[in-house]
Structure formats: C-alpha cells, structure tokens
Amino acid sequence: MRVSCIVGRLRSCLLIIGLAASAVTPREALAATPAGGDIVGAIRDSTNAAPLPNAEVGVTQGGRIIANASADQFGHFVVHGVPAGSYIVQVRLIGYKPDSQTVKIADGSRINMTFQLVASATQLEQLTVTAEAPIAVDTRSGNQVYKQNDYHGAPSNTTSQILQQSIAGAARAPTGEVHIRGQHAEYQYYVDGVPVPSGISGSLNELFDPSVVDRIEFQTGGWDAEFGNKNAAVVDVRTRIPTGGFHMNLDGYGGSNSTDGQGINMSDNIGKWGFFLSGSRQETGMRQEPVLFDTATLKPINFHNSGQDYFTFGKAQFAPSDRDVFDFEGNYSHTHFLVPFDSANGITNDHQNEVNSFANLGWRHRFGNLDSTSASSGELFTGFYYRHGSLAYVPNVDDEPGFFFFPDTTTPYNINEQRNFDTYGTKVDFQWRVNHALEFKTGVQASVTTGREDFNSTDSTGAAGPGSNSDLKGHDIGVYIQDAYTPVEWLELRTGVRYDAHVAPFAGNQHQVSPRVKLSFFPDLSNTFYVYYGRQFIPTNIEDLRAITTVSEGGDTTSTSPTLPERDDFYEVGYVHRFPAGIVWKLDGYLKNSSPGIDDNTIPGTAIVTSVNLAQVRVRGIETVIEVRPGGPLSGYVNFAINHAYGRGPVTGGFFQTDVANVPGGWFDLDHDQRISSVASLVYSKSRFFASATGIYGSGLTNGADITQPIGTGLFDFNKDIHVDPSFIVNGALGYSLLIGNTVVRPQLFVDNIFDKRYLLKGAFFSGASVGRPRTLEARVDIGI
C-alpha cells in the first residue's frame, strides 16, 4: 500500500513537470528574447574589497520601489526580469554610507554592477532613515523576511515572540511558544546556513538573544528537497556581520514585574577578519504566562513565576579571497525559573534549570565565474555543528505530591527530571549552475545524538515510584538532489527528491523517500504565481520516556508504542503582487494531511513533555500578507490567517488518563488550533524619532472542554464551545535618538497590552491552562559607540 501511494505521488509530480515543460518548446526557449533584463552586482568594502553580506538592495524608478534584494555571503545579489528602462539601484548597510547608481536595462540584457561602500565614522545614518516596518515579502519566493534593525518590540521579547509576530499563520501560545500553521513547534533553525537541531521537549529556554540577528527569512511552504527535519517553518537566520571599524553597543532596561536586563555587543574588522561578541542577561517576576486568575474578571494572579536568562554569542568571520568565506560561531544560553502552580491544589515549589548551546563552523567556496548568472559556476558549502542541551526539573522536598499514574488514583507523586543530550553533525551541499537556465544542487546532512534521561517520581514518604534512567543514542541522515529549470524568464520549475532515515530508542529505523515539485510563473516583476507539492518526513526528538508512559497508562499498549516520525502530504498554491504605491500583497492557501501526526503532552503541574502520535492530522489554511512601504514616514504590515488543525486517534505515547481521541465523531481540534490569527503593525519615523503600534488578534486556542457532539471540520467551523474567547491586544513603542559626539544615545519606552485586556490564552488540554499577561511597561536606553 505504501509503495503504491509513493508511486502515485511520483506520477503526479511527473505529470506537473511534463505540463510545465510542454508549455515552452526548446526552440521557443532558445529563440525568444527575454522580456526585461537582469541586474547582477557585487558589494565590497572600499578599504579592503571584502565582501559585504546582507546588504539591502533596492531598485527604484520615479521614486517607486520596483524590486528588493539582499547580498549573499559573498556580497553578490541578482534581480531578475527588470523591465526595460532606466533605474536607480540603491545599496544600504548599517555601518556604511548608502550608495546608489543609475542603470539602463534593455530586453535580454544582463547588467553587472560593483558597489564599493565607505564605512561611516559614526552610526549617524541610523538616525535619519525613513520608517521601515520589520517585515518584508520576497516577491519572487513569497517568503517573509524579518530585519532586526527595524524591530521596535519590547527588550524582554524573546526570539519565539518575534517569530509569532513575523510569520503569517503563527499563533501566540503559552510559555512563549509559537504555533505555525496549526502545528506544534515543528520549525527548524539554520544559523548562517548551518542547521541547529531542536532541544529537549518542554524546554522554555530561548536558543539565542534576538540582538545577535541581522535578518531572518521564513519559509513556511514550498520547501526544496534540501530542507528536511522539522520544517513547518525553515527559520533561516543570518547573524550580525562585523562591518567597518570598532563598534560597541550598551543597553539596559527596567519595567513592570521587577523586570530588568542589560546587554553589550562589540564588533571589529581587521583585514580579512571580522569579529562579533554579544552578552546579555534579563530577570523578571513574570517569566511565563500566569496560570492563576480571577474566574469572574480573568484578572491574572502572578505567583511563583520569576526567572533569569543569560546569553552569550561570539562569531569570527574570515574571507581569505573573493571565493571563500569561513564562519565560526558559538552560543551559550542558560535559564532558571520557578514553575507557576495553583496553590489551591497544594504547594509545589518546583524549579527548572536549562542550558542550550551550539558551535558551528561553515565554509563556502565559489567556483567558476563569480559575477555572472549566465556562465557556468558553482558553490560548495561545508558545515559542522555541535549542539548541547540539558534540562533539570527539581521539585522541593516539601512539595505536596499531586500527580497520579493512572489507573492508580490513591498514591500521588512528585516528579523529578534530569535530561541532557549532545548532537554532532555535518551538512555538505554542492550547487552547480550549468547555464542561465539550469541549476543542480545535491547534499547530505547527518547527525548523531547521545545523552541521558533520568526521570523519577517519589511519594509523600520519599519512596521511589515509576522512573526511567537510560542512555540515549540515535541518529538522523538526509540525502537530496534537486534542480531549478528556467527555460524562459517567466517560468521556473524546481523539482527534487530526498531520502531521510531516523533511528531513535524503541522506534527502530524509520525512513522515507520524499518527492517535491514547485512550479512558479513570473508574468512580470510585479507578479508571482506558484503551485507546490511536497512529501514531508518530520522525526521526533531522540528521547525516551516509554517506561513512564507505560505505567501512566496502566500498561496500556498505546503508551508503550514508540512515537514515530510524522509523514505528510503537503499542497500549496500562492500569489504575490507588488502594487505601484509601495504595497506588496501575498495570498496563500495550503493543505496538509498527516498520518501519523505529532503533538506533545505535558505532565499536569510540570513542564515535563513527551512527544505523542495522533493517527491522523488535517491542517487547512488560507493566509495573506500586506507589506506597506509607500515612502515617507509611515510603513507597516498585516499578517492574517484562517487555519484549522484537527486530528483523530488513537493518541499514543502520552500521559493521558483517558483516551482524548474517544470523542463523538472521532475528530477533535488540536490544542494548538486557533481559527484566526492576525498581526498588524504600523511604524512612524521622522528624523530621529520613531513610534510604533502592533495589534495582535487571536480567535482563541482550545479550552479543554469535553466534546459532546461531532465537531465541524470545515475551515470556517469555529467550534466556539471548545475554544477560549477571542483576544486582541495592542503593543506600543516610541523612542528618540541623540547624537553626542560620536556616540548615539537612544531612550525608548515600550508598553505591551496598552489597554490591559484580560483574557484566557488557552485552556487545559494536552498541557495546562494559561492566562494572558497584563499591561507591562519597560524603559530602555541604548548607547552606541
């Protein structure tokens, strides 16, 4: 049955490929003169000719933005299909003076440009830029792009909160989690091209401080065969690149709930070497969303909820030639917090300590012609990575036991967890452009994970209960090959196939072959239309809590079943349009069928989590993005998504006392299902002053109520009786920059939940209930040297 399904999908892919290829005959492809031309450029430092990655490129005509691009790791950029005419190409990079050149495009032309940027003596250019919203849309791929320099969120905001406010279809969830397109934390970080595997299930420690980020590109669909693992979203992070001479930035903030934090980052550029170093700490009396509230007014009661976070990050970049770039990065983060609890159910003075760290080494080497997209050229990327994580959940000796291992309802237990892991891996990719129309890419990613998992329980007398103490060992391997074929400028066909193998305790060797195909049409520079199909294989973390789940289900075989990788069929169609007035609009629809699906289950009253399987998961959604950059002091963006994520059992491998899938009709909305998620942000900037406002709306996550009748499974079936009420909050910020000699001083004020709205964020379902945070104020001062 499985083989016939795969063959059927491959036939569908081949049919799409054949239809696309038949649309343009070889003679037409060779003879037709392309409409418009390409702009290809290189951006260098004027003092040492070093490449300048991440520089922002804008093509304008008559004051209107025609296209945007950014420089890659070698300082190169390309803009395809620019209509014939005269344009101004502008380049901007923090730490350098802006530069621009005039260019004239003819049909079929390919213009090569070189920019030599001059370092600025101060950061003065940051004081006079026009307003920029932090989110942009790539009109060719449809991906959203986040720029840290344009972000005006509260200093205590985490990387996860930035993801939620940046990605269309992302839902705000408790403990800083983010649910993307109805899926539960199934996203993968890539830091400067090197993958960073996910941490321990239940970890609330952020991987890195947002201040180390330069830009992030989010890919929530249309994945090439290169991308495997947890790819509900590929979070492609480019960390800050040292530019110019020595720079240092200091910041400090304080605010509501005894919140305070300090940070420092420094960078320098010495010849072909660049260095960046960052460190920060923060402390707050409200580390997580409160779990207590007045049931009549929904006013949150903040109790036993303090925490501290520490981050360090260092990066060295070496560019020995215009063909080679080496990046070495190291990151360490540590979190300690008290676990909130409801005192009505007894005292549980529990603490959680977490550590996350990674070290990456990446090398890129270019072959062939460096400054032309028409000639044969290639690129080799080799990355090595190390990932460490640990989680210690420690109950107090005086805790009142409160957890029961079903079906025993007479002996309560306290829960203790000590877990750690180490992952070693490599990623190697080779890309070869045969000519302007055809490009191939192939590669492999492999990693080995080892660790130890010590999970135990004790009753009120101190006697040991069920436990699991075992070594962990497993590995993941992924191999792929893909191509991009552009017979004419208005058509691109991307096809590929990947093979994944996942070995984890009790799961054995799980593997899959996954075909993928994306067909894109570019009628002109302002319009993009694409369709996509991809087979997905999403493995779980290499962990083992089966000994505990066996007892928690009273020996039920559903709990002893290993949690297996998620297997998906994913379909997507999208359209992107750039309007003349500086507005970009994206409309996207998607459908995902999973068998099995993956979720996670939390032990009540703790943060201890294990992955679980659902026999089937269905996700349907439509989302739209509007980016507004008309020129002048205002800019903004709107993310709006309507999404339905639901599943059916059996649910295997969790801590459930009853079968949550045993409901009328069999289907139930998942605990991370929220029908409507929307974010709207507006930024005003005039000279040295800025002000911003961001509204966040959610129609409501599940409330944990019993399902008494079959739910609606349509996209517009809101199933309000099993969801909390909708919520809408507004966050605001304002600041002013002062120039004192060569030093920039920027005082800023941030207010989250300006109108102090009271609402339930989520009810108890797969995990506990949480209430929304009350109004908070934070004041921050940045000093840039």
Where are the regions that the model predicts?
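Flexible loop and strand-edge segments within Gram-negative outer membrane beta-barrel domains
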Residues: 284, 303-305, 323-373, 380, ...
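Periplasm-facing N-terminal accessory domains of Gram-negative outer-membrane beta-barrel systems
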Residues: 24-137, 152, 171, 193, ...
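Conserved C-terminal beta-signal and adjacent last beta-strands/turns
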Residues: 319, 668-785
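Periplasmic N-terminal accessory/gating domains of Gram-negative outer-membrane beta-barrel systems
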Residues: 64, 96-97, 104-116, 125-185, ...
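Transmembrane beta-barrel wall of Gram-negative outer-membrane proteins
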Residues: 256-283, 294-336, 354-371, 434-438, ...
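Short strand-turn segments of transmembrane beta-barrel domains in outer membranes
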Residues: 204-206, 215-223, 234, 238-268, ...
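Membrane-embedded beta-barrel scaffold of Gram-negative outer-membrane proteins
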Residues: 377-397, 522, 529-530, 534, ...
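Gram-negative outer-membrane beta-barrel transporters
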Residues: 590-593, 613-707
